[in-house]
Amino acid sequence: MGAAAPAESADLGNFWKAGEPLLQGPDALAAPMSRSPSTPQTTPSPQGRQSPWPLRSLTQSHIQYFQWGRPVPSTHLIEVRPTQDPAKPQRVVSEGWRRPALPGETALGRDLSCAWEGCMKGGLCRAWNPGRTWSPVTIGIAPPERQESPWRSPGQRARPAGRPAAQELLDPCTRETLLGALSQCPKGSARFDGPLWFEVSDSKGGRRNLQPRPSAFKPLSKNGAVASFVPRPGPLKPSLGPWSLSFCDDAWPSVLVQPAPSAIWDFWEATTPSCGSCSRVSFALEVTQSAGPFGS
């Protein structure tokens, strides 16, 4: 039995490397089955047994980030409170929206200096990063007071007790509204009862007495009597004096001669035309003027 014991210890020494302690008792069962013989084993701590696997902190939770609908692997760890559920992390609030910490207790009472600094700091952060702010203050703006229209009469301005304001508005296009506005307008109220300018004589108003002017177109007179034109049957007589226009000429006369005032009565004499079947029309102008080839 004594020889078998050293042989067994020699076999164990070959199995374990030198300098590696052997686990005895219940610690031998704590060794992992997948550990290789060459891996050194850690010495048990005096507090108790230590697990070979790294312990996971209870205050840390792995967060999976998503980008454009696809999961992106990330190793960032965020701290969550132990009272919260790690499976449902809450949204992280920015510093600008965090409430300042409550003032601490001192021997003389609450320390309000830190709270004041926190409020000032938070106000500055909100001023720099306004974001979406909601104000609890409601501002009410009253509509402007409606001024009374100057086109309404004093009787219409007085509002009856039982009449609403909507019925008081009058249509500006109605006849009554226009007449009421014209009655209040000072312009046009003066009346002129005197004679008109053409009714005032020269002695009173100093204006000239307008008499009927003689007409520029005087009738032809002979021996002081006004001759009336009476058409006569038969052809007209040709005359060289008056301005004549022959309808049988092929070409338009280049020079038109105007008659003299003494030969006016020769226009009314009828003569035999030189062309036989053609007729010659003669007429005269009272005012002497030069005429062009086209009578303009």
From Swiss-Prot:
Please give the superkingdom of this protein's source.
Eukaryota
- Compositional bias per record (Low complexity), positions renumbered to this chain: 34-52
Q: Where is this region: Disordered?
A: 1-54, 142-162
Q: Give the UniProt family note.
A: Belongs to the POM121 family.
Q: Please report the name of this protein according to its UniProt entry.
A: POM121-like protein 12
Question: What is the originating organism of this protein?
Answer: Homo sapiens (Human)
